[in-house]
Amino acid sequence: MATRVEEAARGRGGGAEEATEAGRGGRRRSPRQKFEIGTMEEAGICGLGVKADMLCNSQSNDILQHQGSNCGGTSNKHSLEEDEGSDFITENRNLVSPAYCTQESREEIPGGEARTDPPDGQQDSECNRNKEKTLGKEVLLLMQALNTLSTPEEKLAALCKKYADLLEESRSVQKQMKILQKKQAQIVKEKVHLQSEHSKAILARSKLESLCRELQRHNKTLKEENMQQAREEEERRKEATAHFQITLNEIQAQLEQHDIHNAKLRQENIELGEKLKKLIEQYALREEHIDKVFKHKELQQQLVDAKLQQTTQLIKEADEKHQREREFLLKEATESRHKYEQMKQQEVQLKQQLSLYMDKFEEFQTTMAKSNELFTTFRQEMEKMTKKIKKLEKETIIWRTKWENNNKALLQMAEEKTVRDKEYKALQIKLERLEKLCRALQTERNELNEKVEVLKEQVSIKAAIKAANRDLATPVMQPCTALDSHKELNTSSKRALGAHLEAEPKSQRSAVQKPPSTGSAPAIESVD
């Protein structure tokens, strides 16, 4: 019998789970709403568990008192079971709150979020219909299981065993509920810690954004300064090139003038050289002529000497002739001397002309030296300009190096920005993982709450069965009214016991689902 009751409860729980899963697919709540609903439901479950512990002892005493009366009422058993099953359904309709019914109907009907909520009367009617269907099936299964037993003692023994099992299960469920409450408190603490870390990450993000903005502003100022410096350098370079071009043009004009003057001087020098050559040739010709004259005079002297020798021989014979010839020769000698002096004077004049030509040549050399000095000064100015140009080129190289350094700094800042963006993305990924963990924990909590509600319904059904058996045992109306009050208490207590019973499969599921949660624990540690 106990196995059949458990199978019926499992079938009821499977249907409720399917309905809740369908309700989840149709309607989703925000994490904050789920958290608030879960805390309220857990508070209600805790209260029901306390009431169940208080009522367990009173129910056991009532069962012992009514054993004798139940033994006598076996004849009217079947009719009373059917009547009390319907009465129990109607009583449970009144006990279930309309809000719970609406919530259960929303969870069972997929896509109920999109529909508008009907009025309270329609909600009650729908809840009652659903309850009649589910509870009627379970009551019929329990009654069939009890009908298989022959004697009422066996039925009572089976019910007592089932009740003891339910008590043990309720205690275990209470323990599990305490463990789950502790886990929930830990999860809430972790959630608060994660929220604080999220706020810290947002602050860090805002700081990084402000730093990026400051860097962009600094980069803009650096770019503007570099552009201004480049413009100033270009203006300076243009001015220097213009000044250099003007000086080059002036120097070229001076060089052209000097070339023209040098050409004139060269022509004059060529003409003077030709004149000097002509004078030298004339002087050479005159020297040759003078040499010839001297040779001729030497020959004449030789002839005179020969004549003198002859005359010496003929002195004696012709002293008169000799004297005459001597006078004649003296005259010729004086004439030749006069000619010699004239030739000397001509030579002096020619030497004077040569000195004049030499003076002119020296003046030409002085003019050439002056032109060379001007050329050297021009070369010095050119060297100065080249030095200035080299200095300007060095300055441009320095500015280029500064600009390259600034570009390198900008690239480094951009790399740092990319690294920080990667860190920010990693933090976002960690936050998404933590949000997934929170969602998974919330879904587990919702599943546990739904299972607790299913167990509550099972306990209420079992309480209805016990109340039906008690009504069969008591023929008098007064004990029946007392039993009704006990039934109401039993329903509340057995709901709590049902919550404990549902917590066992949930704990098993959580144990099955713990590996992914433990896998997510290193992610939380990495965030810390």
UniProtKB/Swiss-Prot annotation:
Sequence intervals crossing the membrane: none
Cellular component annotations (GO), alphabetically ordered: cytosol; nuclear membrane
GO molecular function: DNA-binding transcription factor binding; syntaxin binding
Coiled-coil ranges (or none): 153-464
Domain of life: Eukaryota
Tissues where this protein is expressed: Ubiquitously expressed. Expressed at high level in heart and skeletal muscle. Expressed in brain, placenta, lung, liver, kidney and pancreas.
Composition skew (Basic and acidic residues), residue ranges: 1-10, 104-118
Location in or out of the cell: Nucleus membrane; Cytoplasm, Cytosol
Residue positions, PTM Phosphotyrosine: Y283
Induction trigger: By bacterial lipopolysaccharides (LPS) in Hep-G2 cells.
Region listing for Disordered, in residue ranges: 1-36, 102-130, 486-528
Record's keyword terms, sorted: Cell cycle, Coiled coil, Cytoplasm, Membrane, Methylation, Nucleus, Phosphoprotein, Transcription, Transcription regulation
InterPro entries: Taxilin_fam (IPR026183)
Location of Phosphoserine modifications: S79, S86, S97, S105, S517
Modification sites for Omega-N-methylarginine: R12, R24
Bias-annotated ranges (Polar residues): 508-520
Single GO biological process annotation from the record: regulation of cell cycle
Further comment found in the protein's record: Depletion of TXLNG by siRNA decreases the percentage of Hep-G2 cells arrested in G1 phase.
Similarity comment: Belongs to the taxilin family.
Record's subunit section: Binds to the C-terminal coiled coil region of syntaxin family members STX1A, STX3A and STX4A. Forms a heterodimer with ATF4 in osteoblasts.
Physiological role: May be involved in intracellular vesicle traffic. Inhibits ATF4-mediated transcription, possibly by dimerizing with ATF4 to form inactive dimers that cannot bind DNA. May be involved in regulating bone mass density through an ATF4-dependent pathway. May be involved in cell cycle progression.
Name of this chain's protein: Gamma-taxilin
